Amino acid sequence: MSAKIMDGKSIAQQIKNEVAHGVQKRLKQGKRAPGLAVILIGENSASQIYVANKRKACEEVGFVSHCYPLPETTSKAELVSLIKQLNQDPEIDGILVQLPLPERFDSANMLEQIRPDKDVDGFHPYNIGSLCQRIPKLRPCTPLGIMTLLARYDLDPCGLNALVVGASNIVGRPMSLELLLAGCTTTVAHRFTQHLQQHVENADLLVVAVGKPSFIPGTWIKPGAIVIDVGINRLQNGRVVGDVEFDMAATRAAWITPVPGGVGPMTVASLLQNTLKACMERT
């Protein structure tokens, strides 16, 4: 068996085209383009690259993007003040605080300062709670991107045994809620999980988000499974790999996402979808 590749890059481009069409439709109606504000604290090079990529994507679809680079010395009060200012700005539809924040910040508390209807990352407790209650509003971008990717390939997860490896607030936990909503029998594996191999071998749909290169051996993959690899890990030789041992996994799975070019582009595409949605619901 040789797995079919789920090309997140091409699907993300489809979504960008759809969002751009939505923006043009608004402009023809005399309405303004969506506005996204991105807050970046400090000089983290990886975060700077992520922010630049997000702003580029925004410009490609016709959004108005605003970047607020703040020094490493920024206080909690200063960050809260900026978020409150953006909450009240009628031209801003989405507010994104680039993570990770410096260690002295309580990230969860900072994200709670964002108005739920402008929380285009989907991390606010209100939006997570809405997803849990089966009335999703603004959905976390990576899980939303994964669900969109499955849908675009006509892969219906309803009834599948799904395993999410990793229980972060950004991916693992909201991913489990998305899969429950889609009708999966969902298991979440984490650092205390015993007999991980058995769980993986039983999974019809496997989502891995732990940030460890080739953490899941390809030989564990259930024949015919759908494998979604969220990990992005740069090796010492400069090669970028996922959390799943790709080559072996691809001989057993029916479908698999590559790294890079799988989930990553879908996350950015979901951010664009959320921002357009937030704008349309406000104006």
From Swiss-Prot:
<protein>
    <recommendedName>
        <fullName>Bifunctional protein FolD</fullName>
        <ecNumber>1.5.1.5</ecNumber>
        <ecNumber>3.5.4.9</ecNumber>
    </recommendedName>
</protein>
<keyword id="KW-0368">Histidine biosynthesis</keyword>
<dbReference type="GO" id="GO:0004488">
    <property type="term" value="F:methylenetetrahydrofolate dehydrogenase (NADP+) activity"/>
</dbReference>
<keyword id="KW-0521">NADP</keyword>
<keyword id="KW-0560">Oxidoreductase</keyword>
<comment type="similarity">
    <text>Belongs to the tetrahydrofolate dehydrogenase/cyclohydrolase family.</text>
</comment>
<comment type="subunit">
    <text>Homodimer.</text>
</comment>
<keyword id="KW-0658">Purine biosynthesis</keyword>
<dbReference type="Pfam" id="PF00763">
    <property type="entry name" value="THF_DHG_CYH"/>
</dbReference>
<keyword id="KW-0028">Amino-acid biosynthesis</keyword>
<dbReference type="Pfam" id="PF02882">
    <property type="entry name" value="THF_DHG_CYH_C"/>
</dbReference>
<comment type="function">
    <text>Catalyzes the oxidation of 5,10-methylenetetrahydrofolate to 5,10-methenyltetrahydrofolate and then the hydrolysis of 5,10-methenyltetrahydrofolate to 10-formyltetrahydrofolate.</text>
</comment>
<dbReference type="GO" id="GO:0004477">
    <property type="term" value="F:methenyltetrahydrofolate cyclohydrolase activity"/>
</dbReference>
<keyword id="KW-0554">One-carbon metabolism</keyword>
<dbReference type="GO" id="GO:0000105">
    <property type="term" value="P:L-histidine biosynthetic process"/>
</dbReference>
<dbReference type="InterPro" id="IPR046346">
    <property type="entry name" value="Aminoacid_DH-like_N_sf"/>
</dbReference>
<dbReference type="GO" id="GO:0005829">
    <property type="term" value="C:cytosol"/>
</dbReference>
<dbReference type="InterPro" id="IPR020630">
    <property type="entry name" value="THF_DH/CycHdrlase_cat_dom"/>
</dbReference>
<keyword id="KW-0378">Hydrolase</keyword>
<dbReference type="GO" id="GO:0009086">
    <property type="term" value="P:methionine biosynthetic process"/>
</dbReference>
<keyword id="KW-0486">Methionine biosynthesis</keyword>
<keyword id="KW-0511">Multifunctional enzyme</keyword>
<feature type="binding site">
    <location>
        <begin position="166"/>
        <end position="168"/>
    </location>
    <ligand>
        <name>NADP(+)</name>
    </ligand>
</feature>
<dbReference type="InterPro" id="IPR000672">
    <property type="entry name" value="THF_DH/CycHdrlase"/>
</dbReference>
<comment type="pathway">
    <text>One-carbon metabolism; tetrahydrofolate interconversion.</text>
</comment>
<dbReference type="GO" id="GO:0006164">
    <property type="term" value="P:purine nucleotide biosynthetic process"/>
</dbReference>
<dbReference type="InterPro" id="IPR020867">
    <property type="entry name" value="THF_DH/CycHdrlase_CS"/>
</dbReference>
<dbReference type="InterPro" id="IPR020631">
    <property type="entry name" value="THF_DH/CycHdrlase_NAD-bd_dom"/>
</dbReference>
<dbReference type="InterPro" id="IPR036291">
    <property type="entry name" value="NAD(P)-bd_dom_sf"/>
</dbReference>
<dbReference type="GO" id="GO:0035999">
    <property type="term" value="P:tetrahydrofolate interconversion"/>
</dbReference>
<feature type="binding site">
    <location>
        <position position="232"/>
    </location>
    <ligand>
        <name>NADP(+)</name>
    </ligand>
</feature>
